[in-house]
Amino acid sequence: MRKITQAISAVCLLFALNSSAVALASSPSPLNPGTNVARLAEQAPIHWVSVAQIENSLAGRPPMAVGFDIDDTVLFSSPGFWRGKKTFSPESEDYLKNPVFWEKMNNGWDEFSIPKEVARQLIDMHVRRGDAIFFVTGRSPTKTETVSKTLADNFHIPATNMNPVIFAGDKPGQNTKSQWLQDKNIRIFYGDSDNDITAARDVGARGIRILRASNSTYKPLPQAGAFGEEVIVNSEY
């Protein structure tokens, strides 16, 4: 009788252990939460466009002036800004107010910047159209600069299309790019920041968003499409 009781107990224990194992196997793991096709297919409801679609929208229109922001729009320039922060103000953003940093950034540190592929495609398209190309940046102006040559060389911009970089600077409470866009009669302006889009709208230009790379040192990342503007797909690189 004792052997029968022990056998029944062993069977019950084995069944309980097996049930626990099945339950554990079928329960979601916090380390492996999984996903589903609905989540994978989910897209933000914003106005996505491609470079080809932008080009098509300009078909039949005469050459015009177009503008680009620089940092995180045509260049991934975080390496220079990272070095500037580490060198001049590791614990704060004060390096951005340091003229020595801007002298270095505008005179050579863009050699460490990576040209963005989306910028290459856009600039090639506008060169084919015969558009005048401007770069309007919020960087502080310096007595000398090599940024214009770096951009012309990296993106193979002919002298007939290229214009010297405009250093609009940064003034609290003021969008310093707006007046420059108006003065140069820029009809399309590409940028990664909210200020780029609002500057274009201030002067009746077409503002088109380029995505800022998620590993940019410029945080927080902006909410692309928040103004209803066009946002270029795959433009983070």
From Swiss-Prot:
It is an enzyme of class 3 (hydrolase). NCBIfam families: AphA. Residues 1-25 form the signal peptide. Dephosphorylates several organic phosphate monoesters including 3'- and 5'-nucleotides, 2'-deoxy-5'-nucleotides, pNPP, phenyl phosphate, glycerol 2-phosphate, ribose 5-phosphate, O-phospho-L-amino acids and phytic acid, showing the highest activity with aryl phosphoesters (pNPP, phenyl phosphate and O-phospho-L-tyrosine), and to a lesser extent with 3'- and 5'-nucleotides. No activity toward ATP, phosphodiesters, glycerol-1-phosphate, glucose 1-phosphate, glucose 6-phosphate, NADP, GTP or 3',5'-cAMP, ADP or ATP. Optimum pH is 6-6.5 with 5'-AMP as substrate, and pH 5.5-6 with 3'-AMP or pNPP as substrate. Keywords: Hydrolase, Magnesium, Metal-binding, Periplasm, Signal. Activated by ethanol. Inhibited strongly by EDTA and more weakly by other divalent ions chelators 1,10-phenanthroline, EGTA and dipicolinic acid. Inhibited also by nucleosides, inorganic phosphate and Ca(2+). Unaffected by F(-). Its EC number is 3.1.3.2. Its main location: periplasm. Homotetramer. Binds 1 Mg(2+) ion per subunit. The active site is at 69 (nucleophile), 71 (proton donor). Its cofactor is Mg(2+). It catalyses: a phosphate monoester + H2O = an alcohol + phosphate. This is Class B acid phosphatase. Mg(2+) binds at residues 69, 71, 192. It is found in: Periplasm. One of its GO terms (cellular component) is outer membrane-bounded periplasmic space. The gene is aphA. One of its GO terms (molecular function) is identical protein binding. Substrate binds at residues 137-138, 177.
